[in-house]
């Protein structure tokens, strides 16, 4: 899909949307959602060569974790990662993520942590981090997970304060025996997981 706008045009569109919502709601912190599709064409699985990309944009007030969630952490459940093999592609084909997220909702949990072939991948809409012996560990970049916007930020913060940071394959057993578990995402920021499948995390 060709980029339908220049960098300056994207920025201007975002500023216009954010300003409009701020005027209506007074919300200072907002989430901008941008969806680009290939465009309008007769229904076919083949990609139309001459379609003009369609752009949809919206903004919503940012809803960060509550004070209680920050203080006490959240509960998660786990599941087998049954999604397709290209989870690194950010697309609107999110049925696997939707089903995983619904599993956590059905159990009164904040997220569903996913495992494939015995190793941690990610959660339904978050990256997952393991704290072990003072080091922050995350799964390596691969086709099995989508790299979130907090990944590089966490690396930088670890470097600043001298915490070891390592991306490597993480067996499920290491997740369940972790000293701490964390979620990160654009809207969750960095959030502690204090229970996994009903069991307390860490000490």
State where each predicted segment sits.
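Conserved alpha/beta cores of soluble small-molecule-handling proteins
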Residues: 1-111, 117-119, 142, 151, ...
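Glycine- and Gly-Pro-enriched alpha-helical subdomains that act as flexible
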Residues: 115-141, 145-147
């Amino acid at each position: 899909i060709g980029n339908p706008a220049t960098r300056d045009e994207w920025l201007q569109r975002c500023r216009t949307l954010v300003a409009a919502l701020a005027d209506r709601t007074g919300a200072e912190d907002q989430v901008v959602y941008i969806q680009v599709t290939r465009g309008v064409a007769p229904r076919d699985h083949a990609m139309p060569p001459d379609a003009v990309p369609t752009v949809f944009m919206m903004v919503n007030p940012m809803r960060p974790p509550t004070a209680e969630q920050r203080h006490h952490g959240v509960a998660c459940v786990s599941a087998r990662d049954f999604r397709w093999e290209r989870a690194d592609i950010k697309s609107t084909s999110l049925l696997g993520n939707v089903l995983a997220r619904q599993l956590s909702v059905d159990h009164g949990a904040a997220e569903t942590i996913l495992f494939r072939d015995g190793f941690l991948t990610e959660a339904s809409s978050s990256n997952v981090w393991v704290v072990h012996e003072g080091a922050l560990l995350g799964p390596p970049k691969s086709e099995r997970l989508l790299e979130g916007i907090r990944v590089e930020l966490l690396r930088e913060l670890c470097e600043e304060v001298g915490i070891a940071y390592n991306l490597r394959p993480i067996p499920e057993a290491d997740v369940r025996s972790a000293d701490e578990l964390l979620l990160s995402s654009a809207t969750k920021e960095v959030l502690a997981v204090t229970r996994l499948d009903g069991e307390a995390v860490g000490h």
